[in-house]
A protein has these predicted regions:
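Acidic, low-complexity proline/glycine-rich segments
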Residues: 2-31
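Long, contiguous binding/interaction regions
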Residues: 2-5, 9, 71, 103, ...
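Disorder-to-helix initiation segments
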Residues: 26-48, 126
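Helix-loop segments that flank and shape redox-cofactor active sites
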Residues: 32-40, 55-80, 143-159
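A structural signal for well-ordered alpha-helices, especially hydrophobic packing surfaces
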Residues: 56, 63, 82, 89, ...
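Conserved alpha-helical segments that form or flank metal/cofactor-binding pockets of metalloenzymes
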Residues: 60, 66-109, 178
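Acidic/histidine-rich alpha-helical segments that form the ligand environment
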Residues: 62, 94, 108-166
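Short, contiguous alpha-helical
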Residues: 87, 161-193
Length: 194
């Protein structure tokens, strides 16, 4: 009796030869938008997707590592925001695909593409966690507003709507909740009245 390894006994289908569309290419889709417009939108969507994935991971990290008097409230809030960021990721990735592009998906690609700095591996204080989240949201919001304006100018109303109605509004609401949690103090160290 000859024993074969599982990897030898199955017809493996993955590998470079089986890639049907390279990242960075734009497949033709008949939606009334030219390739250049779709390519520009895909780039902005993938950047927002990478930053949203990093923000999602920050929320889960802080959900697991939060401590202190507000543990319970923040533990739940961070998990709620995490879930809402996951919904945004799905919408962003599907829009990339609908425009004929390839969405970022692998963690190493996301870490490389994201403009949001990687956090330390260790546990941070609550003010540091919230400050880090606020900075990440601000990064997403600044870039999203630019991308929404460009999509609008290019006639890509679907991408503009996704940025404005979903990504910007969700991130602004998250910022509101985080800031209200720190109503007695400023997470960025600014003095009141300054």
């Amino acid at each position: 009796m000859v024993l074969t390894r599982i990897s030898e006994s199955r017809n493996r289908q993955h590998g470079k030869d089986n890639v049907i569309q390279e990242f960075g290419t734009v497949y033709p889709v008949p939606i009334g938008l030219g390739e250049n417009v779709r390519s520009t939108s895909i780039g902005a969507l993938n950047q927002t997707l990478a930053d949203t994935m990093m923000l999602r991971d920050l929320y889960k990290k802080h959900h697991w590592q939060v401590s202190g008097a507000t543990f319970y409230q923040l533990h739940l809030l961070f998990d709620k925001h995490y879930a809402e960021q996951v919904e945004l990721m799905d919408a962003l990735a599907e829009r990339v695909t609908a425009l004929g592009g390839v969405p970022l998906a692998a963690p190493h690609d996301v870490a490389e593409a994201s403009a949001i700095p990687r956090p330390p591996k260790g546990r941070e204080s609550v003010p540091a966690q919230i400050s880090r989240l606020l900075d990440a949201h601000e990064q997403v919001l600044i870039e999203c507003r630019k991308a929404a304006k460009e999509a609008s100018q290019n006639g890509d109303d679907g991408t503009n709507d996704l940025f404005v109605s979903d990504v910007i509004r969700t991130n602004e609401m998250h910022v509101f909740f985080l800031c209200e949690h720190l109503a007695d103090g400023d997470p960025h160290g600014h003095q009141k009245g300054a």
